[in-house]
């Protein structure tokens, strides 16, 4: 028996993503987005761009998807989730973020229908509309007080 991990299968892809967990008066900022599975709910989230820091990606994705400017203040968690077809594994860095402004009239990213504010219970009542299990998990971890300092993450240019 080999002590080495198996070779990764051909076609396996790792996607690094970020998500902003933004709470205001007991409601969380979410997006309704079009997916191949229909309209789904998600945090403002997306892929890390080449050369971009995780913190910059979090702020950028929130702005592009909701027109809200946000400032990450803590890491909520790091989540590994393999898509059901096994072709993609997502590693999501979820950040607690504060609102820092709103750009009225900003055109949202393609596929984003609108930004919505929902309570945890409202979100939990419609699991069939979640983009992934990470949507509620990140909010539950946030509500459980999980916060890690941002200096845990190092970005080198």
Where are the language model's segments positioned?
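Conserved Nudix-box catalytic region and its N-terminal flanking loop in Nudix hydrolases
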Residues: 24-64
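Charged phosphate-binding loop/patch that engages nucleotide di/tri-phosphates or the phosphate backbone
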Residues: 137-157
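Acidic, metal-coordinating catalytic segment for phosphate/diphosphate chemistry
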Residues: 1-19
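Short, solvent-exposed loop/turn elements at beta->coil junctions and helix N-caps
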Residues: 8, 76-84
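Conserved beta-strand and immediately adjacent loop positions that scaffold enzyme active sites
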Residues: 19, 27, 114
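Short connector loops at helix/strand junctions that flank enzyme active sites
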Residues: 15, 23, 43, 70, ...
